[in-house]
Amino acid sequence: MDMKQALNRIASNLDLSRDEMKDVMRIVMNGEATDAQIGAFLMGLRLKSETIDEITGATEVMRELATGVTVNAEPLVDIVGTGGDGANLFNVSSAASFVVAAAGGYVAKHGNRGVSSKSGSADLIEKAGINLNMKPEEVARCVEQIGVGFMFAPAHHGAMKHAIGPRRELGCRTIFNILGPMTNPAGVTRQLIGVFTRELCRPMAEVLQRLGAEHIMVVCSKDGLDEISLATVTHVAELKDGEITEYDLTPEDLGIKSQSLVGLSVDGADESLALIKAAFGRSHDETTEKARDMIALNAGAAIYVAGLARTAKEGVDMALDAMGSGLAAGKMSELADFSQCF
């Protein structure tokens, strides 16, 4: 299928098959489509709503064209969000990555700079003194030896450059906003994924089910966070043993008291890093305790997804231990030191 055929199909409110979507995505990612065609394609998909087949095909092509990272370590997991929730919270998923590593997991963290937020995961990682410009084999060594490594998305998805202009000019969410979390360059099959709307929870779980994922939790909280929230109910679509189940979680279900998010918003990577370091330390003021609990909720779920705990609640206990013992702070320092060797 060529670009004009695809645009005519979408303009008629007709869906593309998985293979047709792969054809069109290759045209886009190989630089063979004009900016006008890419913009029309992205907006047309959004207006008619992307199907499971279309998202699956697009994900396959992004994975196919990515610069991969081969990691020889298990259990390998990622904690990632779509972004776009507008809450400007500190970098919960990045903080949780160090906690999971401290609990015995291996985290291949995939992320980018902030677009809608004031501190994206890459901004935080860089501020922590961690080298963003590593080769794939160097990232793999970080994961294997430290337990955590960071893959800077633009370095692994070079073909995305062809869509940057049209995406920026459109200025709204498109299919690319939901593809990032599903295109981890290390090929992880265990993930905690946060999304900006509950409507994406099950579709993303279904896409990853088709693509062979082992254990996935896709989450969105009632207050709109792409995280498990400390303040309210979080909706979950969980893929485990080949089956998808949907349910709601409260902080109390995981052994944590519900609390407001006041004090957890930040104005940039500096503030985010300071709050994470406090949470990893021995401070017991109210805001630090909230941050620690928020990290524990998400790290605990990831520890469970990694297979290191029988339940997410057990994972939360392990996460709190990893922070209280100083091991999580140690992982952050170790990665900063080790990554600067390259």
Swiss-Prot record:
Binding site for anthranilate 2: 167
Keyword Metal-binding part of the UniProt annotation: yes
Pfam families xrefs: Glycos_trans_3N, Glycos_transf_3
Residues annotated as binding Mg(2+) 1: 93, 227
Enzyme Commission identifier(s): 2.4.2.18
Cofactor: Mg(2+)
UniProt name for this protein: Anthranilate phosphoribosyltransferase
Taxonomy of the source species: Bacteria, Pseudomonadati, Pseudomonadota, Gammaproteobacteria, Pseudomonadales
